[in-house]
């Protein structure tokens, strides 16, 4: 029997929970004005006394809330309670791995990793300088290209005199030969690139019968290094190298330059070019813009110039290439070509770049850089201006590296689609269909079948922001994953279009932690380690883009990361103190995961101003974990019914009837709720106590329901299970506490978009529950638990094996995650920070349970290393 689709399943699983009380929104169900406010104080008496009283003040009355031997004090200065003073013989102690992040471990790591406090003045200076870079983005900043400058310098004077039309470019060549006799990017060396640029400059100087010394030095360099081309990897070849290099070799031969024409590699590449020229479809060459326009100087013997002019860009160039445009001008005299070249020289003075303009690529990569480095919050206005510019040039077939570029680039288009969609722009994934061949494979440019690692990485990252039903995005995901895994198997997994510091590290991270299974601070830490401020780019020649690769970005990212980390460390210490002072450290049936819980929220809502949000979320999660463990390991249904009743009545006088461990739990919850309510009232401008209590009652009812199932060994239907378990996972409860402290005043309408009534909250809970169950059901079954998504699904479908049921659950989860993405990206009425909190809770669940039970077993799993890197280990 086939599994029902996610859409059909969600149609009969209620989006809301079925409770008798209204849903937890304002106005509250409870008459909050009639509920007394209790404030904690403690009176431990003499140090010798065994009796400790906890007092809660109601107005001027002092009520004894806990009396007797072993009663709990919330004061951090009270006597430490011994666990063995109140064992419940019926309470099942669970064998959890002990917490790793104890105070001594934390103190030891922090003391050994001390870094100097961030220089606030330096931070402000860097922010100002980077803002200036964004504001200065015009047509694109890039370094000189000796190769393109040589082609422009070949253009003869229009008056027929024996001089170059652009003499300043010839002078630039004479003055910019490197010490080793070559021309090219001084601080990066690729044999192909250096020889190509050097050959172009030698030819131009020879044409103009000048610079004999430079020509001779260039020839010597060429002879010395030409044999090295055979050993350099093919994907280090500049774009169009197989066309332009052999063409220049032929020209050099006609000029009688003394070069090693008989080298096997040179003979081989000449033959390769001849074969490729025969395969170029002429109908394609002249009818639609293709990447061939980028290197027309290497195709001169086959080009019909009067036809190719029809594909000229509006700015007069051919794919923004000065060299290609110069070649067309020398063959046609086209005035628009000359206008473009004049414009380039007006901009750069005495040289030409590899591309001009390159405005779209520069803006997109700059935005991507600050976002991935985790410093984008400083540049919101600049990012919006850049993205508005990109969007204004967005086309139904994608975009290229420049606004007038008629050939779309898959790397730029994929990055644009992803970033625009993540920032709320309406863009269709249909643009990706432009880049598919007849076999369904994706290519980089029209007319070229080769692909680069960076292009495929950008396409892969783009595929993870797909909406349900976007088949082209799903196909892109599968295609790029296959390509990237294969690239990693190559020892030289380098890129076709760029020389990045650690492209292998970027690919490994993207494949291991895709967007739905990553968190912002994790990605920032990874990219800080992989980002190269001196990375080079490879077009027809090598070039640098200083507004994309710049040490200022990295310096700010490091200062900011370490500063935020130091703030988080102080917060974690306070939370550890609260954990102990609340008596939770003495409970023997629960898990000490304070650091892991704090990591999950600090990796998402990391900004310093969200400290209260982090504290509330962490404390609430700790209480949820404790109560979940209490209900799972309950001594009796009666005890937890009493706990539920106390929460409903909010009645401290029920404490005397509670076992000591339950008393600790209730007092901890009671004081936390009051703390949150008081702070929430200040932030929201209205009473939120009833709202918070209502959330806890809903949460505890689901815990109670699951405890009853366990007690009765009852396996519910899948529908019944999901209705309860998608709430018991506690995602909605936790984020609904947290959203009160995101800096927004929340209306009833906003809350209705993210509370239990919303599809957003339902999908968050559903995906969290399903990933949790897939990784914990076997261990919990061994402890006597009978209800999980897998077991309940098998009850409904006895024809399925456990393995088959597990696959169906994974399919359901992936479909639900796709719907969750759509809710996140399309929600317009919810403030961004509120959306982030909801969505990143779901992402954190996927991260923690990616390989196993990363929460319970966190001390023994990779989560431990994540916690260390984000919370304790500064960036050097």
Curated annotation (Swiss-Prot):
Mg(2+) 2 binds at residues 628, 632. Its EC number is 4.2.3.44. Residues 1-64 form a transit peptide. The lineage of its organism: Eukaryota, Viridiplantae, Streptophyta, Embryophyta, Tracheophyta. Its cofactor is Mg(2+). The keyword Transit peptide applies. This is Monofunctional isopimaradiene synthase, chloroplastic. It comes from Pinus banksiana (Jack pine). CDD domains: Terpene_cyclase_plant_C1. It is found in: Plastid, Chloroplast. Pathway: Terpene metabolism; oleoresin biosynthesis. Belongs to the terpene synthase family. Tpsd subfamily. Mg(2+) 1 binds at residues 628, 632. One of its GO terms (cellular component) is chloroplast.
């Amino acid at each position: 029997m086939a599994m029902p689709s996610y859409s059909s399943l969600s149609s009969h699983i209620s989006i809301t929970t079925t409770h008798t009380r209204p849903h937890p929104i304002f106005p509250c169900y409870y008459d909050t004005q009639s509920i007394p406010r209790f404030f904690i104080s403690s009176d431990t008496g003499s140090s010798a006394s065994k009796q400790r009283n906890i007092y809660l003040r109601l107005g001027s009355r002092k009520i004894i809330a806990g009396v007797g031997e072993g009663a709990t004090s919330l004061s951090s200065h009270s006597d430490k309670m011994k666990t063995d003073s109140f064992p419940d013989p019926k309470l099942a102690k669970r064998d959890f791995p002990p917490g790793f992040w104890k105070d001594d471990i934390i103190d030891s790591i922090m003391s050994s990793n001390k870094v100097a406090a961030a220089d606030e003045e330096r931070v402000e200076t860097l922010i100002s300088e980077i803002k200036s870079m964004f504001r200065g983005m015009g047509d694109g900043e890039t370094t000189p290209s000796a190769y393109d400058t040589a082609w422009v310098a070949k253009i003869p004077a229009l008056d027929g005199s024996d001089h170059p039309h652009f003499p300043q470019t010839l002078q630039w060549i004479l003055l910019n030969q490197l010490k080793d006799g070559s021309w090219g990017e001084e601080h990066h060396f690729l044999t192909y690139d250096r020889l190509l640029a050097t050959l172009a400059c030698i030819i131009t100087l020879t044409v103009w019968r000048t610079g004999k010394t430079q020509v001779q030095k260039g020839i010597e360099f060429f002879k010395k290094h030409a044999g090295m081309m055979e050993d350099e990897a093919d994907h280090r070849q500049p774009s169009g190298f197989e066309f332009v290099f052999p063409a220049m070799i032929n020209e050099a031969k006609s000029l009688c330059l003394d070069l090693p024409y008989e080298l096997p590699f040179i003979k081989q590449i000449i033959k390769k070019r001849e074969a490729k020229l025969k395969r170029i479809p002429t109908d394609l060459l002249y009818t639609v813009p293709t990447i061939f326009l980028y290197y027309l100087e290497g195709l001169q013997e086959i080009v019909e110039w009067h036809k190719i002019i029809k594909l000229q860009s509006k700015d007069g160039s051919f794919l923004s290439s000065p060299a290609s445009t110069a070649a067309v001008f020398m063959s046609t005299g086209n005035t628009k070509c000359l206008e473009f070249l004049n414009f380039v020289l007006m901009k750069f003075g005495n040289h030409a770049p590899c591309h001009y303009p390159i405005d779209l690529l520069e803006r997109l990569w700059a935005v991507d850089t600050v976002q991935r480095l985790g410093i984008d919050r400083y540049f919101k206005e600049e990012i919006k201006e850049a993205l508005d510019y990109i969007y204004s040039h967005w086309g139904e077939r994608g975009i290229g590296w420049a606004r007038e570029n008629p050939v779309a680039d898959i790397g730029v288009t994929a990055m644009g689609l992803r970033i625009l969609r993540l920032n709320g722009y309406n863009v269709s994934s249909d643009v990706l269909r432009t880049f598919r061949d007849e076999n369904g494979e994706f290519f980089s440019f029209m007319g070229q079948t080769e692909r680069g690692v960076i292009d495929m990485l950008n396409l892969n990252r783009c595929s993870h922001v797909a909406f349900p039903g976007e088949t082209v995005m799903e196909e892109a995901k599968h295609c790029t994953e296959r390509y990237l895994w294969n690239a990693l198997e190559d020892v030289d997994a380098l890129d076709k279009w760029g020389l990045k510091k650690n492209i292998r590290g970027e690919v490994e991270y993207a494949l291991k932690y895709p967007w739905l299974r990553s968190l912002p601070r994790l990605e920032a830490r990874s990219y800080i380690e992989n980002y190269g401020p001196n990375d080079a780019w490879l077009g027809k020649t090598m070039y640098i883009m200083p507004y994309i690769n710049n040490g200022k970005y990295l310096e700010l990212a490091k200062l900011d990361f370490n500063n935020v980390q130091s703030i988080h460390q102080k917060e974690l210490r306070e939370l550890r103190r609260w954990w102990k002072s609340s008596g939770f450290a003495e409970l023997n049936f629960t898990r000490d995961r304070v650091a892991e819980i704090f990591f999950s929220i600090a990796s998402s809502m990391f900004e310093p101003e969200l400290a209260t949000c982090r504290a509330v979320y962490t404390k609430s999660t700790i209480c949820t974990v404790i109560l979940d463990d209490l209900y799972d390991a309950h001594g009796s249904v009666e005890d937890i019914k009493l706990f539920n009743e106390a929460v409903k009545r909010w009645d401290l006088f029920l404490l005397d009837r509670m076992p000591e461990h339950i008393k600790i739990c209730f007092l901890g919850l009671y004081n936390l709720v009051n703390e949150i309510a008081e702070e929430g009232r200040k932030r929201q401008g209205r009473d939120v106590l009833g709202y918070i209590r209502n959330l806890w009652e809903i949460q505890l009812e689901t815990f109670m329901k699951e405890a009853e199932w366990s007690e009765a060994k009852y396996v519910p239907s899948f529908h019944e299970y999901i209705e309860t378990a998608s709430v018991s996972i506690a995602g909605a409860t936790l984020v609904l506490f947290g959203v009160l402290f995101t800096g927004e005043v929340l209306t009833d309408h906003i809350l209705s978009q993210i509370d239990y009534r919303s599809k957003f909250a339902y999908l968050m809970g559903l995906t969290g529950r399903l990933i949790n169950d897939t990784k914990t059901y076997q261990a919990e079954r061994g402890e006597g638990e009978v209800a999980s998504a897998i077991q309940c699904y098998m009850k409904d479908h006895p024809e399925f094996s456990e393995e088959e049921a597990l696959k169906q659950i994974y399919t359901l989860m992936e479909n639900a995650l796709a719907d969750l993405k759509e809710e996140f990206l399309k929600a317009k009425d919810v403030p961004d920070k509120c959306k982030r909190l909801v969505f990143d809770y779901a992402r954190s669940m996927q991260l923690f349970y990616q390989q196993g039970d990363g929460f319970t077993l966190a001390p023994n799993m990779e989560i431990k290393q994540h916690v260390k890197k984000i919370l304790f280990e500064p960036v050097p």
